[in-house]
């Protein structure tokens, strides 16, 4: 583990990654497609969201499971597509697939993943979905 006890926010994780990873790899991970407009808009929208916890509220038998396209998952979120994860940590793709399987959450495999969709299916069973990312340059 990379000292996860010292990471309590996204910014903590980002700062630690920036210190630990080679600059080229950090820049690849932090960047997004094209002019990064969608990424910037997502960040703006997420900055406007405030989650208020219900401290000491009685919640009996909470249900976090969800369904998507007739697939049942244990949590209402999954692992987003990320390209070249093995650059940052060898075996990261396999770890992501095994984690998705363990917690029964979906995993979307990037077109630019370090491993094949077949490998993700082998490691994570039916948790792996595929993001087809078309580039007009190659069409």
Predicted region positions:
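An N-cap/entry alpha-helix motif that binds or orients negatively charged groups
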Residues: 2-70
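Conserved small/polar residues in nucleotide/adenosyl-binding loops
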Residues: 137-139
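Active-site beta-loop-alpha junctions enriched in small/polar residues
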Residues: 82-84, 112, 133-135
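Alpha-helical segments flanking ligand/cofactor-binding loops in enzyme cores
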Residues: 94-98, 118
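Active-site-adjacent beta->alpha loops and helix N-cap segments on the catalytic face
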Residues: 90, 109-124
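Conserved, mostly hydrophobic/aromatic
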Residues: 22, 79, 100
């Amino acid at each position: 583990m990379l000292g996860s006890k010292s990471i309590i926010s996204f910014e903590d994780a980002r700062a630690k990654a920036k210190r630990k990873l080679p600059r080229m790899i950090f820049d690849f991970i932090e960047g997004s497609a094209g002019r990064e407009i969608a990424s910037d808009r997502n960040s703006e929208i997420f900055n406007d969201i405030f989650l208020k916890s219900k401290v000491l509220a009685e919640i009996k038998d909470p249900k976090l499971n969800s369904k998507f396209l007739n697939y049942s998952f244990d949590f209402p979120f999954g692992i987003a597509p990320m390209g070249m994860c093995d650059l940052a940590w060898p075996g990261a793709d396999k770890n992501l697939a095994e984690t998705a399987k363990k917690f029964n959450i979906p995993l979307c495999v990037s077109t630019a993943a370090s491993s094949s969709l077949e490998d993700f299916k082998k490691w994570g069973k039916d948790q792996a979905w595929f993001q087809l990312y078309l580039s007009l340059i190659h069409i």
